[in-house]
Amino acid sequence: MAVGKNKRLSKGKKGLKKKTLDPFTRKDWYQIKAPSSFQIRDVGKTLVNRTTGLKNANDSLKGRIIEVSLADLQKDEDHAFRKVKLRVDEVQGKNCLTNFHGLDFTSDKLRSLVRKWQSLIEANITVKTTDDYLLRLFAIAFTKRRPNQIKKTTYAASSQIRAIRKKMTEIIQREASTCTLTQLTAKLIPEVIGREIEKATQGIYPLQNVHIRKVKLLKAPKFDLGALLNLHGESNTDEQGQKVEREFKEKVLEQV
């Protein structure tokens, strides 16, 4: 009888004893902090793999874009149709410090604004803030009926549309180029620019639903940690100790 392996015997399957590790055991939660220009600072949490070897967790977090509803940031449901983009610029401990990265409208809100018998006027302009942020702002407006108007339609003439668009770009340029990004964000939340456009164009054609529908960040200046910490209401300078005044006593040697 030949001595050898019996192929008929069932072999044990490989990999049965291998334990499956939960991928979440290698990850950590980090808190996302919104700038102090918003009412609610705690946006949420994000996951990232722990620092292992040359892979640093902070490097994986920096540059992440978070999209949040403005209603959640301001505790006001009237802002539910606007979405704010925040970019992680710095990680301190378990906190991700973010900066404003853009603004947009929800698609359902934009579709609800477009109606029959009225003219839609759009304008966009590229502006530079005083702290060297290059932004492109998109504005939208709709014509409305004049007082005591009998006519069903409210279509504006081409010359009126051009005049309104010129007025829109002038106001956006004036309001955005004379302030910092933080000050511009403070103007965008209560829609100050939209109301300014509505008032300025009353003589050309009455408008309604005037909004800055989108803000796109094209270029940001060189990263400044001090400016970011000030934006979050923190300081990068260490607390200095109090000076203690003591009476000076000269030591007298007893033996020479």
UniProtKB/Swiss-Prot annotation:
Q: Which residues form a coiled coil?
A: none
Q: Which Gene Ontology CC terms are recorded?
A: cytosol; cytosolic small ribosomal subunit
From what superkingdom does this record's organism come?
A: Eukaryota
Q: Which UniProt keywords apply?
A: Acetylation, Cytoplasm, Ribonucleoprotein, Ribosomal protein
Q: List the GO molecular function terms.
A: structural constituent of ribosome
Has UniProt tagged this entry with the keyword Protein transport? Answer: no
List N-acetylalanine occurrences by residue.
2
User: Disulfide connectivity?
Assistant: none
* One Gene Ontology biological process: translation
> Which Pfam family, just one, is annotated for this protein?
Ribosomal_S3Ae
Matching InterPro entries: Ribosomal_eS1, Ribosomal_eS1_CS, Ribosomal_eS1_euk
Please state where this protein is localized: Cytoplasm
HAMAP family per record: Ribosomal_eS1_euk
Query: What is the annotated quaternary arrangement, including any partners?
Result: Component of the small ribosomal subunit. Mature ribosomes consist of a small (40S) and a large (60S) subunit. The 40S subunit contains about 33 different proteins and 1 molecule of RNA (18S). The 60S subunit contains about 49 different proteins and 3 molecules of RNA (25S, 5.8S and 5S).
Protein family according to the UniProt entry: Belongs to the eukaryotic ribosomal protein eS1 family.
Record-given protein name: Small ribosomal subunit protein eS1
Q: Which organism is it from?
A: Sclerotinia sclerotiorum (strain ATCC 18683 / 1980 / Ss-1)
Q: Which gene encodes it?
A: rps1
